[in-house]
Amino acid sequence: MDTKIITNPSEQDIDMLARALRNGELVSIPTETVYGLGANGLDPEAMDKIYAAKGRPSDNPLILHIPNSESIKPLVTEVSTTAQALMDNFWPGPLTITLPKSDLVPDRATGGLPRVALRCPDHDGCRVLLQRAGIPIAAPSANISGRPSPTTAQDVYNDMNGHISYILDAGPCIIGVESTVVEVHDDKVIILRPGGITKAQLETVVSTVEYDTALVSTETKPKAPGMKYTHYAPDAPMTVVVGTPESVANTFNELSKGIEGPIGCLVSHETYELIKDDSRFMCHCFGHHGDALALGHDFYKSLLHFNENHVTLILAEGVNDDGFGVAIMNRMEKASGHHIIYK
């Protein structure tokens, strides 16, 4: 199979992609978070193709993407007042809501769980395709399972060429980190996966917002996509350092002693100024120190860049674990295998 990249799609191209999705083919779709690997969310055989292409365990739930909140009605058995408030305030956007599924939704989409994960993406091109397809689209990140998520069409092609039919190219993703996944119980919201919507943002709509205890467990069946098994990992071993630019630079110098070959460094501009003279360091600057949004935008992109350049070690500067930083540090923790140093 030759994978075709569709850039600047015509109306005929959108119709073709919608038809391919309805017919059970795999199409990579752009969103504001990362590129998704799309399949018909009502067709178990189509979703099996996702698991096969990604090498993803089938008990890992999928997110169904829909063009608007009205599309949720046939997919769930109930929508609470709290869930409706979240949709009204954060859709379209990087928020995934899990709700009791209807019989229309196959178990294959939920990993056998009684709740289905649903999201309306904040991406015009994606929503046009979803509307045209007329079906919910199951779409985990369009990468081989365990590797960094793709934020460009080329990233998708590098992992999925020959495994999927089409890639809809809409340029780089704006956010660069996956959606927040929540579960709603009466008037309480539980965060199953941190992401593009922060806890503080949710608290402007719902009074009680908590993190799920399973966020720190690897022993239970995942209730949300991306919360079990190895995720986001680069090819080289990775260590994250959180601290001032000076302490981060000093720690990088200590960790790099005796290392042969290029060392990938994901750093702020301030830290870069302190380590730029070391020729072993291949630096990717994400922005100013502590800028979680900038780090999130560049995180996966930098890991894939380091993979392409075959670095022997990756040293990354982390951020404070608050606000959007919670989502970033969650991804960094997983990518580094929990190798995080606080200075």
Label each region the model flagged.
Residues 1-343:
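Active-site-adjacent structural elements in enzyme catalytic cores
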